[in-house]
């Protein structure tokens, strides 16, 4: 996915311009500038963030074999990083999704049948990642958006943790199995035609002007890092899956 030098340079410029935000340093302490100059700088930073995100979307169109990550979180009982429970003898793994939808709020502790696909990451991967930063609320939200491959000011307000049976999860890549630590760029021979259609349709609709940097490699595109594009391991909960809502927590409380 890495683009040519000029695109990489633009990304570096974006990150340099955004360093004041990312390291949580007040602009007033960083620059000797008038209020008008500071406002102009803020507008420039916001513009550059949008450009950086769009470059990530364009970059993600081309998924290459050298970008395969061999350390994805596998959804297996022997993965001690995961959190499990058993209900009626069936194992369920704790997953989390970032959302602004209020439909989960009154379902805590209850079972719920999903009427849409829900994109999730395994608990506690996201919390472990964000704990290395000391950011104020605005910068923390931005870093989460970057890590999860979402556009800036995306409007997510809460994290919803849910218990999910592994059979209801798949990786959003040509190789949907969840029990290994990497994704193949090719469809396995046993993948159903309907799933191939799902992937191909997502490819056609994911990379436009208002698109998302879907890697198709089992991880989110971290467009805020200068060292790696690899974000969180991502999984989709199937439509019709019955899950148990564990908690609904606002963004700042969840990650602090």
What annotation goes with each model-predicted range?
Residues 99-100, 119-125, 148, 163-168:
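Short, flexible loop/turn elements at secondary-structure junctions
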Residues 33-119:
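ADP-ribose/NAD+-binding catalytic cleft of ART/PARP-like enzymes
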Residues 1-9:
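N-terminal secretory signal peptides that target proteins for export/translocation
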Residues 27-32:
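Sec/Tat signal peptide C-region and signal peptidase I cleavage site
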Residues 124-141:
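Short active-site loop/helix that positions an aromatic residue
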Residues 13-24:
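Bacterial N-terminal signal peptides
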Residues 92, 101-104, 125-128, 169-171:
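Primarily extracytoplasmic ectodomains and periplasmic/lumenal surface modules that are beta-strand-rich
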Residues 145-256:
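Conserved NAD+-utilizing ADP-ribose enzyme module
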């Amino acid at each position: 996915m890495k683009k040519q030098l000029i695109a990489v340079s633009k990304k570096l410029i974006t990150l340099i311009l955004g360093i004041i935000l990312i390291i949580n340093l007040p602009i007033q302490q960083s620059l000797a500038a008038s209020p008008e100059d500071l406002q102009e700088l803020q507008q420039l930073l916001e513009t550059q963030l949008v450009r950086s995100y769009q470059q990530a979307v364009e970059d993600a169109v081309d998924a290459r074999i050298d970008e395969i990550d061999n350390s994805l979180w596998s959804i297996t009982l022997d993965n001690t990083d995961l959190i499990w429970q058993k209900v009626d003898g069936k194992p369920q793994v704790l997953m989390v999704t970032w959302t602004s939808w209020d439909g989960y709020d009154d379902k805590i502790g209850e079972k719920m049948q999903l009427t849409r696909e829900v994109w999730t990451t395994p608990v506690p991967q996201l919390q472990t990642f964000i704990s290395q930063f000391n950011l104020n609320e605005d910068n923390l939200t931005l870093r989460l958006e970057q890590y999860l491959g979402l556009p800036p000011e995306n409007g997510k307000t809460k994290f919803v943790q849910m218990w999910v049976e592994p059979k209801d999860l798949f990786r959003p890549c040509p190789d949907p199995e969840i029990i290994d630590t990497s994704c193949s760029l090719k469809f396995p021979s046993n993948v159903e035609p309907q799933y191939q259609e799902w992937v191909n349709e997502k490819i056609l609709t994911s990379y436009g002007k208002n698109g998302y940097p879907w890697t198709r490699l089992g991880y989110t595109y971290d467009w805020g890092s200068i060292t790696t594009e690899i974000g969180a391991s991502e999984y989709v909960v199937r439509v019709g899956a019955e899950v148990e809502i564990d908690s609904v927590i606002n963004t700042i409380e969840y990650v602090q």
